[in-house]
């Protein structure tokens, strides 16, 4: 968040499973639409927050399975853990806040052991301020009421969350997705970067707390669970800041951005024109997003008159522009782009997608910029990522590529110098 110098125009706080991530969308099209929009229009000065019931361990597993962007802040384990940045640095003040609650894991484990219908979830899901169980179908509501009374008699003040008809989570009363968001908003206000607008996004009763916070916009995606929609009808039906979208998952989030006029809602993936590249219309971050969309579509064989586009991009490179390939080879950038003609349609019919993450633009001197980002490629089930740096310069009112340097990311599944990685 160090890049922020003023109040972010928008902070999106989104659940992951069945909200940001559509597990029925095997091509991840809605997620990729959101990714392009965020990196193009929002990454520079806004905040992306994921709020999930997953533990940090399961969150990292999801990142390996789906093309998730890197959030600025991650709230995990049903709001009991908060971390910042790519390194997921824990918020120790939040931990101390929960430590001060009437909470004792040993007492929770002692009392829950009296219920044979409860089975502890794997160790990865047992956290400092969360104890999680599976429960026999149909027994959740009665058990949670009885367990709540037992824990209250033992001096604890807890929330017991029954979800999906099979999960029971016990957390401190002061924890939860809503409480974590309220804490986060106060923290941002104290740091002078309180967001102008906040959009909360969810699909299940786990997320209901997010929609109860004053002055926060909310979207319940079209595929939301009946329990959440029932909660809305009883608690938020007349709240004009909370809508039930007509689109699923990430598409519903984009729809809400437009509905509330929170900023641009046209994803670059919905635009087919790549040639409008004057400085008045594009910045270096935009150029990166658009180029790699072009690159993806070219290799998928989806662009008519692709040679015209290749010629245009080639002309946007200095004659001496250079590419430092992750293999260690040094190549002419103009020649590399020209050779893309040979790759047209080589990924046709395959699950081939390209996206960029953490696009950061830095002004060096007037008329020169450095753009750093992660460039990802996925072909079928194989993913590769390079840490990428591009140097741009201004020439005659146009944005010109000067240098591209790529090195393999530690997250990349494939780090050999195979020939499929071009740029």
From Swiss-Prot:
Pfam family, one: S6PP
UniProt pathway: Glycan biosynthesis; sucrose biosynthesis; sucrose from D-fructose 6-phosphate and UDP-alpha-D-glucose: step 2/2
Molecular function terms, GO-annotated: magnesium ion binding; sucrose-phosphate phosphatase activity
Superkingdom as given in the UniProt entry: Eukaryota
EC number: 3.1.3.24
Reactions mediated catalytically: sucrose 6(F)-phosphate + H2O = sucrose + phosphate
Keywords for the protein's UniProt record, in alphabetical order: Hydrolase, Magnesium
Cofactors: Mg(2+)
Gene Ontology biological-process annotations: sucrose biosynthetic process
Family: Belongs to the sucrose phosphatase family.
Quaternary context: Homodimer.
Functional note: Catalyzes the final step of sucrose synthesis.
Family matches, as PANTHER family: SUCROSE-PHOSPHATASE 2-RELATED, SUCROSE-PHOSPHATASE 3B-RELATED
Protein name as it appears in the record: Probable sucrose-phosphatase 3b
Annotated source species: Arabidopsis thaliana (Mouse-ear cress)
Taxonomic lineage from the root: Eukaryota, Viridiplantae, Streptophyta, Embryophyta, Tracheophyta
Gene name as annotated: SPP3B
